């Protein structure tokens, strides 16, 4: 029986990939406050390595990164784990259209606090009740 049938024991694993360590720490703290298990990687290669060894349900990847950009990471993630949902983030508005076709959703970093949780819930097929208020 899959653990997802026992919600009291199931905490989905999310993987955040961003070259900005401060952003990664904020994402991790925010998502863990809502019960997610969060893995982080500071570049695409490390993220792909983590995804190959963990049952990651959702990948949240920044578009603008050195070495491998978010589109390249998403393409390789699709090959590695086709069942994994991918959300692309960017602080800029000039993400190429073809990059958006590789992912399941896009969230602007300026809307992270209000859009990330509903986007994750929608992709996972969860009831889209408003998330509980975050208490710091």
Where do the PLM segments sit?
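Short hydrophobic/Thr-rich beta-strand motif most characteristic of the beta2 strand and flanking loop
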Residues: 35-42, 50
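Acidic catalytic/metal-coordinating carboxylates
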Residues: 42-46, 69-73
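Conserved phosphotransfer cores of two-component systems
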Residues: 52-54, 76-84, 101
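Active-site beta3 strand of CheY-like receiver
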Residues: 54-60
